[in-house]
Design a protein with these regions (language model features):
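Short beta-strand/loop motif that positions the catalytic acidic residue
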Residues: 288, 294-296, 300
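Catalytic nucleophile-loop/oxyanion-hole region of alpha/beta-hydrolase
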Residues: 106-107, 135-170
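Alpha/beta-hydrolase-fold enzymes
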Residues: 179-267
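Conserved alpha/beta-hydrolase
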Residues: 117-140
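Short beta-strand element of the alpha/beta-hydrolase
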Residues: 93-102
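The serine-hydrolase catalytic nucleophile loop
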Residues: 103-115
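Catalytic active-site module of serine/aspartate enzymes centered on a nucleophile-bearing elbow/loop
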Residues: 327-361
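An N-terminal hydrophobic leader/cap segment in hydrolases
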Residues: 44-86
Length: 361
């Protein structure tokens, strides 16, 4: 979970400062003129269209759900956690939540929510997988990087299908927190109709990196990611001395930096990819045809209330949409001081699932 307090800031600074500085410093060491730099940058941008159409041969994987890990579409293995009520010994739970954690987080971030649900009801199970490129990725060289954001969507769909096979009678709910909200929203858009969940919960969504960024700076940042996709940047070095509070007590971030899943440096392509996902969140909402729950704290440094309100309004008016706003809460709602109330609201929303049939278009 470490890095939540700085990853959005990092994307902003990558787009505003870091990428430009990285480009200029790299080329200055090579004594390249500014004219040549500009020419090379535009060539890279124009050629990116061709690069995007170059698709590697598909890998035929053998997806499987093992005791402590699952095998994804490309035979890569990722750990996961599950919290099952005792009732699953003789019947499928009514609802299975599939949680997607935030940046520099891990599957255990859903522990608080899971234990609340296990204590208060016996009809809900929760699964949460480790995200590719994050701190519990078994391949250390891949931590802090992702080749394409589409890999996240594919992993989510595969994991969901494997969980469905375990609980064929259960309704599936995707739950995305922070960066996870980007993955579930875009994953829904990219999934086939039969692969989509019955409902989605969006906690602390990241909506727009910065609407005031000049177009030329956005292009420069994307150019840097094309030229140096695997170059890594420390999030702390980009924070400009700012350390936003992510919970009321604000001790989680200090502790998280000591965790084994903490990532100190991220690649440019991952950060710019996240920025692109955040910028297009509003465009994803109209395609959603299942019930949606949106949770947001009034003291969330990264996304303002009006942005979340606009995001909620962009969903189709025909769907069941619930928006809970907590004026005194911060970004990490599942760790914050109002979490018991938030968990209670989530549980109440889940009660409505029995009134809905699976709806996906």
């Amino acid at each position: 979970m470490a890095g939540h307090a700085s990853w959005v800031l990092a994307i902003r600074f990558v787009w505003l400062q870091a990428c430009l500085a990285f480009m200029m410093s790299s080329f200055s060491r090579l004594a390249v003129s500014s004219k040549m730099l500009a020419t090379f940058a535009w060539v890279a941008l124009l050629s990116s269209c061709a690069m995007a159409t170059s698709v590697a041969p598909p890998v035929k994987g053998n997806p499987q759900l093992k005791k402590d890990h699952y095998v994804s579409y490309d035979n890569e293995k990722f750990g996961y956690r599950k919290w099952l009520p005792k009732s699953t010994a003789h019947q499928d739970p009514a609802i299975v939540i599939i949680g997607v954690h935030g940046i520099s987080g891990h599957a255990g971030d859903y522990d608080n929510l899971a234990h609340y649900l296990l204590k208060h009801r016996q009809d809900v199970a929760l699964y949460a997988a480790e995200t590719r490129g994050q701190g519990m990725d078994p391949k250390e060289c891949r931590r802090g990087d992702v080749r394409r954001v589409e890999q996240w969507y594919k992993d989510l769909v595969v994991f969901t299908e494997l969980v469905r096979q375990e609980h064929p009678k259960s309704k599936i709910v995707w739950f995305g927190e922070s960066m996870g909200s980007l993955i579930v929203m875009h994953g829904y858009q990219n999934a086939r109709r039969e692969q989509r969940p019955h409902a989605m919960a969006i906690s602390s969504p990241i909506i727009e990196v910065d609407s005031e960024l000049p177009t030329w700076k956005l292009l420069a940042a994307k150019c840097a990611a094309i030229l140096f996709p695997k170059a890594r940047i420390s999030l702390e070095s980009l924070s400009d001395g700012r350390r936003p509070m992510v919970t009321k007590e604000d001790i989680h971030e200090q502790q998280a930096a000591k965790n084994p899943w903490y990532i100190r440096r991220y690649t440019l392509r991952l950060l710019v990819g996240l920025g692109d996902l955040a910028q297009s969140m509003d465009q994803m909402a109209p395609a959603v045809s299942c019930p949606v729950l949106v949770l947001h704290g009034g003291k969330d440094f990264f996304t303002q209330e009006d942005k979340v309100n606009d995001f909620c309004k962009s969903f189709n008016q025909s769907i069941d949409k619930t928006h809970h706003y907590y004026p005194g809460s911060y970004h990490l709602l599942m760790y914050d001081h109002q979490r018991v109330q938030i968990f209670s609201d989530i549980s109440s929303w889940l009660n409505k699932m029995g009134d809905h049939q699976r709806s996906s278009k």
